[in-house]
């Protein structure tokens, strides 16, 4: 996999542009999604941004080598809000390299804008991916107007959905990153089925380690700190410069990384047992009757909150019963049905608090 060196970026200099005296100084502030608490201002520098950019461009070298498509002529459709770090870093990366970036007015106008502005690639969150998937499976791919590369991030994706799209000619790239790392972290450009549940290969721009299962990162993409919040900064940035992501992960010998949950999301039962809600949500994902689900704790029991059609509730109960038979007793789930879609933030992440 090709890596773009820092020197490549510094070569994009023009005589009429004054060089910034300190690339490590704060240049802009992005806010965290606030899925488990209040949103925090993340202080980022130009150095953070430009060292993270290669992670957003490198996968397209893989697209070119694996498909033969001319990615130099690609245009992208940006549907994520600009306060999302992935949207910001992608926009700057593609603009710097001379690509066309089409901006979607609002998500509700997605199909209108995609039809008006032909785009080869787009970053998607689970809700948007599900809509694209439904169109493809219903034989309505013409609505996508040539869209063929999907970069997936912000949450876990159903591997069966990804495989179906790949079987129908889409190139799927998965990503892992945080606002605190300027979106950098890992990219998965492999089209092999065995890697569909991986967020990707660790990135050369950072160092990685696991501390009690928690993924920690250190390197140039890591933030300066939280704006006017030294206490919160000290909770995640240690004295040696390691950023504690809060994500529980494992890294296999081949370098591929797998996320198993969020440290803050872990449910601690009265028995002392720890339960990862994301682990159970993955087990429920294959159920076709489930539109959305979120696992949480209700009265010291594990509860699966499910959004589905009313006539599919029995099918959901049967599926959960089958899953429970494969689990230890303390992980057994009860089902609670929701008539409304589950709450999400603007980036498509479930709001768990």
What are these regions (language model features)?
Residues 1-23, 136-138, 342:
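ANL superfamily adenylate-forming
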Residues 12-31, 37-38, 64-75:
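Conserved pre-ATP/AMP-binding loop-to-beta segment of ANL
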Residues 27-54:
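Conserved AMP-binding A3 loop
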Residues 50-75, 82-123, 127-146:
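Conserved AMP-binding/adenylation subdomain of ANL enzymes
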Residues 114, 120-124, 132-194, 207:
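Gly/Ser/Thr-rich phosphate-binding loop
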Residues 201-202, 212-236, 256, 273-275:
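Conserved ATP/PPi-binding loop(s) of AMP-dependent carboxylate-activating enzymes
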Residues 219, 224-225, 248-328:
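AMP-binding/adenylate-forming catalytic core of the ANL superfamily
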Residues 337-353:
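Flexible lysine-rich "adenylation lid" loop at the C-terminal edge of ANL adenylation domains
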């Amino acid at each position: 996999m090709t890596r773009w060196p820092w020197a490549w970026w510094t070569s994009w200099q023009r005589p009429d542009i004054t060089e910034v005296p300190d690339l490590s100084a704060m240049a802009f502030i992005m806010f965290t999604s606030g899925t488990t608490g209040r949103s925090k201002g993340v202080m980022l520098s130009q150095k953070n941004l430009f060292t993270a950019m290669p992670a957003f461009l490198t996968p397209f070298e893989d697209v070119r080598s694996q498909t033969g498509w001319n990615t130099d002529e690609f245009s992208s459709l940006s549907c994520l809000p600009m306060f999302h770090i992935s949207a910001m870093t992608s926009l700057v990366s593609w603009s710097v390299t001379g690509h066309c970036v089409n901006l979607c007015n609002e998500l509700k106008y997605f199909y209108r804008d995609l039809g008006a502005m032909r785009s080869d690639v787009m970053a998607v969150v689970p809700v948007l991916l599900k809509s694209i998937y439904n169109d493809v499976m219903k034989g309505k791919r013409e609505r996508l107007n040539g869209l063929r590369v999907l970069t997936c991030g912000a949450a876990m994706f159903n591997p069966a959905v990804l495989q179906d799209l790949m079987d129908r000619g889409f190139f799927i790239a998965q990503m892992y990153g945080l606002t605190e790392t300027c979106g950098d972290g890992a990219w998965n450009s492999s089209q092999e089925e065995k890697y569909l549940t991986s967020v990707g290969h660790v990135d050369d721009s950072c160092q990685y380690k696991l501390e009690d299962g928690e993924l920690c990162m250190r390197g140039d993409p890591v933030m300066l700190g939280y704006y006017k919040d030294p206490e919160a900064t000290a909770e995640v940035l240690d004295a040696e410069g390691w950023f504690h992501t809060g994500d529980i992960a494992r890294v296999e010998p081949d370098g591929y990384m797998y996320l198993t949950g969020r440290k803050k999301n872990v449910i601690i039962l009265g028995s002392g047992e720890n339960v990862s809600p994301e682990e159970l949500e993955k087990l429920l994902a294959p159920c076709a009757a489930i539109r959305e689900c979120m696992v949480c704790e209700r009265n010291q029991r594990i509860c699966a909150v499910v959004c589905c059609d009313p006539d599919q509730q029995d099918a959901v109960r049967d599926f959960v019963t089958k899953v429970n038979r494969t689990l230890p007793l303390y992980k057994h789930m009860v089902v609670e049905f929701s008539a409304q879609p589950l709450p999400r933030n603007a980036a498509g992440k479930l709001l768990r608090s």
